[in-house]
Every structure is written in structure tokens, then in C-alpha cells.
């Protein structure tokens, strides 16, 4: 499962849930 992570401003990137 992938979830969005805030990357500074209004942008974001997707990362595997296992990283969190």
C-alpha cells in the first residue's frame, strides 16, 4: 500500500507504507 507524504509546500510524493 502506498501513501502520500508531504514534501515541503503543497507537493507530495508516494512511499510504500513499510517505510513509514
From Swiss-Prot:
One of its GO terms (biological process) is defense response to fungus. Keywords: Antimicrobial, Fungicide, Protease inhibitor, Serine protease inhibitor. Signal peptide: none annotated. GO terms for molecular function: serine-type endopeptidase inhibitor activity. It comes from the Eukaryota. Belongs to the protease inhibitor I3 (leguminous Kunitz-type inhibitor) family. Inhibits soybean trypsin. Has antifungal activity against R.cerealis, A.brassicae and A.niger, and weak antifungal activity against F.oxysporum. This is Antifungal protein. It comes from Cullen corylifolium (Malaysian scurfpea).
